[in-house]
A protein has these predicted regions:
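Exposed, low-structure sequence patches enriched in small/polar residues
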Residues: 46, 65, 72, 208-210, ...
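Bacterial N-terminal signal peptides
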Residues: 11-21
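Outer membrane beta-barrel
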Residues: 80-178, 205-207, 262, 291-315, ...
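Bacterial N-terminal signal peptides that target proteins for export
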Residues: 2-11
Length: 572
């Protein structure tokens, strides 16, 4: 196999990073010095690589829509210096030939460089950060600058951050800067402040009785050019606001086993592509209650949001994953099993009512339901509905359609799942799951109607001895809609302390063409993982089904692919 010329830069860089790290294999065990050094260096390397990706017409892998280069990679190198008074760091990123899912028609992810550089000056009562940084106010309703590499999300802020702690239990933060959007910083200027006060630090009796009460408030301001030309129709130009302000207030209470969080946010008129350039305000309200005691856990949550899509650039495509200032958390369970995650929920910025409830109980050992080793049971239910008008766009330049506060619209998503964890012997344990799901594909994907699914999952782990562990899982998704039934199986052998071998297969239909789904297809994969100290490398080969990768209500479409994949991680 001939390595593509474009791969030489990445290969040389990758090997250069590995060589210093690999020297530790031959060194003696490190002994902690009696006195820690004044300055420490730590960091990490993460490199996801696909070698010689193959065209596979049966599953639509690497057709003319995507880069079919013989070498693809997303590589990240983080370095950080730490000392008593000053910390500093940076990140190198290489996505000149990005992995599947990071190739779009605008080549937004394509490139390489050092997008993140920062220095932090710190004392006991304050710290100041200059450069790039991440931040979140409250639950993220009005500000969440964070990184999620699997989704291609990195909206770090380039500017300044100041945090002051005037006394125990109090913290005040202020920020100002521009957010990253792919490889650029051509966004509106944002500034803001956040304050939190933990009253148990001031009231001794509360602290002694395990009572905690925290109140907080936040403000964010976005500035954009008010003279930008955006037309409401062929004859009318929109009068755009120069400033958009958002506010957040929250209360968090905890007493022994009970906890509660209430939060409310509001945003001034912010016409943008997400809301079809209407001028109504945005709001979000949330209440979360939880209880945990002696094997019993309870959770109840409700959230209402309307017009809370908050971007630092108003006139970008609606499906663009960048430019977000805030993050609206999804009140749905993030599933890790393949078929349970086949139809993931995407938070709707236009508005939604979201409800979630969960109950967990541990049946004690040597009881009728607990058996010899005990049994864990968890029941979870999530329901997301639209607002009164089901997110029908209002006319540009107006205040849009009015929604009554309490009235719900159509069901967007619901998920009822029961999970059971059971140990049968000292060597064998199992995890079982049943899930009922309703997925409104018309709302969440643009077309397709409602998809109703029943999903069955069994997962067993057999600890053969101290060195060998065998795990197997079987999954089946039963539905009369969309692409029909799916099946999935996996077998995984762990050989402690270094190796893990796995083979898996998904069986289902290929992606639709001209509205018609293809024939049944096997999405097979085989992988070997090697762990040594702080190093992990995985080499695999197989097919990947086209679908959505989601975390916390944020999703990215990943096209079908086939080829050799290499994943390397090193922390030092």
């Amino acid at each position: 196999m001939t390595i593509h010329p474009k791969a030489k830069l990445t290969f040389a860089f990758f090997v250069g990073c590995l060589l210093p790290a690999s020297q530790s294999f031959a060194q003696e065990e490190y002994t902690e010095p009696e006195q820690a050094p004044a300055v420490t260096l730590n960091g990490s390397i993460q490199s996801d690589i696909m070698v010689a990706p193959q065209t596979d017409a049966a599953i639509g892998a690497f057709d003319d829509s995507y880069d079919n280069s013989s070498f693809l990679t997303n590589t990240f190198v983080d370095l950080q210096l730490q000392s008593k008074w000053i910390d500093a760091g940076g990140r190198f990123e290489l996505k000149e030939w990005p992995m599947p899912g990071f190739q779009d028609k605008h080549n937004d992810f394509k490139g390489w460089g050092v997008p993140n550089l920062w220095a932090k000056f710190k004392t006991k009562v304050a710290d100041v950060t200059l450069g790039t940084f991440y931040e979140q106010f409250g639950s993220g309703f009005i500000l969440r600058a964070y990184e999620e590499r699997s989704l291609g999300v990195d909206n770090s802020i380039l500017g300044a951050r100041v945090a002051v702690r005037p006394f125990n239990g109090a913290q005040i933060k202020a920020i100002c800067g521009k957010q990253r959007a792919y490889w650029d910083w051509d966004t509106g200027l944002i500034s803001g402040a956040d304050a939190e006060l933990s009253l148990e630090e001031l009231i001794t009796k509360w602290s002694e009785s395990n009572t905690h009460l925290t109140i907080g408030g936040s403000w964010i301001n976005k500035r954009e050019d008010p003279d930008e030309t955006i037309m409401a129709d062929v004859t009318h130009k929109l009068n755009l606001p120069e400033f958009v302000n958002a506010f957040d207030a929250r209360v968090r209470f905890q007493k022994n086993d009970f906890a509660a969080l209430a939060e409310y946010a509001q945003k001034s008129a912010d016409p943008n592509t997400l809301n079809n350039f209407i001028y109504s305000k945005g709001t979000a309200a949330m209440l979360s209650l939880s209880y945990s005691h002696t094997g019993l856990s309870l959770l109840a949550q409700v959230k209402r949001s309307e017009n809370m899509g908050f971007r630092n650039k108003r006139n970008v495509p609606e499906d663009c994953s960048a430019y977000y200032i805030n993050h609206m958390p999804a009140f749905t369970l993030d599933h890790t099993y393949t078929l349970a995650a086949l139809y993931p929920y995407v938070t709707q910025s236009e508005g939604e009512w979201a409800y979630q409830g969960a109950i967990g109980y541990n049946f004690k050992r040597k009881t009728a339901l607990g058996g010899r080793y005990g049994t864990k049971l968890k029941l979870n239910y999530s329901l997301v509905k639209g607002l009164e008008n089901n997110n029908i766009d209002g006319k540009s330049g107006t205040e849009g359609l009015k929604n009554s506060f309490f009235k719900n619209g159509d069901i967007y998503y619901q998920d009822l799942n029961l999970q059971i964890d059971k140990r049968f012997t000292k060597q064998f344990e199992g995890h079982f799951m049943y899930m009922y799901q309703q997925f409104n594909k018309t709302i969440l994907r643009g077309e397709g109607g409602n998809i109703y699914s029943n999903i069955f999952i069994g997962d067993g782990k057999w600890t053969i001895n101290d060195r060998f562990t065998l795990r197997a899982e079987a999954q089946y998704l039963l539905t009369e809609h969309e692409s029909g039934d799916w099946g999935c199986g996996l077998v995984e052998l762990s050989v402690a302390p270094y190796f893990m071998f796995s083979v898996s297969d998904q069986i289902g239909r290929t992606e639709p063409k001209n509205g018609i789904y293809g024939e049944k297809a096997h999405y097979y994969n085989a992988a070997i993982t090697f762990d040594y100290k702080a190093h992990r490398i995985m080499v695999g080969y197989g097919r990947t089904r086209a679908g959505y990768n989601c975390t916390g209500g944020v999703c990215r479409f990943v096209p079908a692919s086939k080829g050799i994949t290499i994943n390397y991680n090193y922390n030092f």
